[in-house]
């Protein structure tokens, strides 16, 4: 009494010695049902009672708990009686249930009398197998508090230690889990952690699948407390407060173990082990195939494959995976890690590894001779005295002080002996089933067998079955085979065979191999005594003789792959003579992309290290660079990408000898024996000359640019170089050409690095294969043995499957039927359909319907909604893909062609008579023309079929079936001037009549009545008359981009009309002509016949094509073209082409000229308003164009553009030095002007005498651009004598000075931005910019060059200068003054007197008047104080008063040059 009950400090108390774990778990589970929980004292008393009970003869298996309860003494301490009572209630017995065990009473009460003893009380009843398992469900008393406690690591370790020796799903395994679940009450997450800690990923995946199934059934059935709105059961079970749902989830979690493979038998694919010499990729491929064939549907394959790829690998691969940390990584990482171990570059050797002989010295444990100390049976002596009791005869772990004191047992009802049996542990030999040979036995070592790429480990052995004489045979050594296989021919007489299921690389089979349970003796050449096997596999097809691991283990043979110590050597393939860089251009220098992500940089370094080890690259320090970067593939592996676009741009493209991939249907059925050869890393075997390394160099950067990068260059031909495929094809063709000559009856198909051999006999195929492999190996081309395939069976080549009489694609696309597609999705599915279209029985109209859905979309994320017609096309293509198949060529049968012309395209079929499948389906779109005759399409299709069949099959089609009627074809040949008429006449003897049915059972897939039905538009629309129709009216029509007009005439003009085209659209003359013809045909609709006269060759050709039957293609005028056939339907038409603008007096030319005049608009002269709106010229220019001074002033003042720009009407003026005649002195400057976010340089040159301007638009202000601008100004104005500029660097450069000297031009400089020295050119800059701003304000999209030319036209030739009344161009090109003879006096100029002021003086009084010597634009020459001097107009005033009628002109004369230059 007074014991404290609580949780046990350890998860699972240790079982008493001698009691099985399964029985102990039953006791513990019953104990944990007590409330309150049992204490350590209760477990100690239970262990004490069970130790005593184990010594009684009543202890049986299974235990009779009723009989065991009778052994409990009265007043036994603890709660042992309650635990046994729980077990009694739950035990199922065939007899009547035993009476409950009386509960121990207190000493104060009187116990009831004991029952009378029975003579058979100690004899247990006969055992009957219980109907239910002895496992209890998880049960908690009602109202008990939650016992949930998260796992700790010591708890998980204790549970894993308990289940480590039990099988998955066994009673011991399940009882341990139930006890742990009942004690800790875990949540769903805790159970998932426990499962991942105890089991492999394979078991976790299978358990997860079964648990989801049970949860779905439970949620459907309904559970107490389950709320579907609160989330799934797994989420609700994670809540510690949801005790009821958590217990339901715990029961489902335990029940999910009932269907795992460990409960009955491990699946066949779980026993696939990697052989000692088997490449890792081949082992993974066997696992993949086995899982595909044996895994239940819906089970995720990836985690199972990843788990088995590590656990079932050999020790060498497991060590490599552990070292790289890839024990549970993605499969791609594991394959890449073990790729270096693949025995493709190793020498395969078979050796016998005997046990070492025992030493001659005595064992230091027992002192005897003849064994190693590790095999000694004596226990290892302790190193010294025990640290606890100082006794040297035992270890510390065996010290008696560490053992609890043995309490004296209370007397039981029976006095039994205390001896107990001892259990001896089983000592297993090191190495499993391998038995070491006797020391006296001679050691046999197998001689080294070098294995090349084309050889297999084959030995000559002798096999004896059932004691018969040994028979010699050749056997294959295969470490991947679990059992030895012999052919049935070695078994004498009938024997009893057993069915068995064999799983290999090609899948499961239960017919070819049988199990032979008869002793078998195998005599090996390196072993004296035979290998004896109790059973083996029997090959009923007599193809295989294989020595498996069961025989190799007995002889202690080992296949291993020794490392090749030789360094990497470049394989002896010839160096190419030409690669396209013989002209040695400067190597490209492209900066490396930033790669600061640690993952990408690490992947790039790993890839470079592997390439460096393989000898594909080497350190480099020369010029040239192309960027590199890694790309992650879908399988998780990284791929090295070298961006060689810069190198490809300077490389000369070599002509490829390959015309493209071959059509595999051309393989004749007379070549049934096939074999494929796949080359690995083929490009990396072609050496690259040293002089080309700068073009293929790259840099590996340091992280965060902490240091200079590492430079490398390729030593072999890299991938990504545009001439690499061509060079490799040339090298491979040179290797295979001798084989083609040696075997003329065989065929060698070569495309890139894939090779297919086809021979008429198997013997010839073996010879061809051996010589081809030898030639490839000799030339240094590595061969992938894993991808080599050979008949019998299907051959996979270039994405297709080759069967004996037909060819299919490896995979056909799965088309989801939905109306909403993105542009990318639709493009991808159409690309997949295009790949398999040659074998899909579908018409072109279905494909064209889907292709048309792509029109108008550019954004890859754009959503496309399919129409009902396009959805129907998807259904039709999905049904046709189920019949995707093509036949192989039969050389004895001719080729036939079937052509179906339709408005959506042409469908062609190449087939042979009486064959099950056609050879090819070809879909051809219509040419991109607005109108194409049907006869031309037929001729083009015939040429396409002849080219295809001649290229792929070596012969032409014997005949063609087509859907063009004989009448339509004859009309086309008789009436059409098309060049294709000669082609059709040449092939007329190969045509069948319309609707003739081709032979072959595949025709039921075509719906031939629909396929060969003649299109309605193929028939002619109207009839052409060769002569003029006297009773029909005449129609004349013509059109322009603005108008369309027609005239209908019959002795008189019946009707004429002019139709304007919409002004907001862009039109062409063809559209106007087509619209005019349509309007005229509508007016002539009542007449059944019509004479049409046109001057448009386009319409004449178009109508001729419609008359002979043509296809209406896509065009910009498709809407108008579609309106023509209904208007012409059934009419008789005479067409006549008229030459325009001939001015001939005949009636046809006269009416044609009259029709043309209806659409011609008269040329209206430019008005002053239009001139100012076009050029924004000044008032005097408008007056010269006929406007009055008042109208000109009003136009300038009311112009919105002129008021917006330069509204002040003021420009800076200055005093400058002017020339005395044109091209005397120029002034130049460079001003900047911003146009559409770009700044341009305007080079401005002004003649100081006439004011003529030249402007050049340049992008820079260099000396070269300045010289170019001067030359352009000279071509416009003439060569100057003197130029004046500022002191800019372009004008002061040596190049510009040399230019001026060579052209004899004097150059001087002035102060920039000074009105007294550079005023003229600065003012001209402002005038030009103002005009440009005005033009661009009126028309923002006006090109800058056009605006500059318009400004020059306005300044030089339109604006009138004051007071000369001439334009700058007139002044600049005015004739020179006649020379004045020395003898004669010069003519006196008309007297012109001016008052003047001197510039720069503060005196405001007018002086003079003086008579002017000469006048120019902006100034007059006066003689002041005896010296001539130019005075600007603003400092001059006429001495004579102006006339009254010219007052208005004088008023505006002073400001016109300021307004507009």
From Swiss-Prot:
Entries under PANTHER family matching the protein: ENDOGENOUS RETROVIRUS GROUP K MEMBER POL PROTEIN, RNA-DIRECTED DNA POLYMERASE-RELATED
Biased composition (Pro residues): 97-121
Source taxonomy: Viruses, Riboviria, Pararnavirae, Artverviricota, Revtraviricetes
Species annotation: Human T-cell leukemia virus 2 (HTLV-2)
Cofactors, names only: Mg(2+)
Lipid-substituted positions (N-myristoyl glycine): 2
Annotated cofactor note: The RT polymerase active site binds 2 magnesium ions. Binds 2 magnesium ions for ribonuclease H (RNase H) activity.
Active site (UniProt): 478 (for protease activity)
Start and end residues of each Peptidase A2 domain: 473-551
Residues holding Mg(2+) 1: 678, 753-754
Record's catalysed reaction(s): Endonucleolytic cleavage to 5'-phosphomonoester; DNA(n) + a 2'-deoxyribonucleoside 5'-triphosphate = DNA(n+1) + diphosphate
Start-end of DNA-binding region: 1392-1441
Region called Disordered, residue ranges: 94-121, 399-425
Highest rank taxon of the organism: Viruses
CC annotations in GO: viral nucleocapsid
Protein name from the UniProt record: Gag-Pro-Pol polyprotein
Annotated site residues (Cleavage) in this chain: 136-137, 350-351, 446-447, 571-572, 579-580, 1019-1020, 1166-1167
Pfam families: Gag_p19 (PF02228), Gag_p24 (PF00607), Gag_p24_C (PF19317), IN_DBD_C (PF00552), Integrase_Zn (PF02022), RNase_H (PF00075), rve (PF00665), RVP (PF00077)
Position of sequence motif PTAP/PSAP motif: 94-97, 130-133
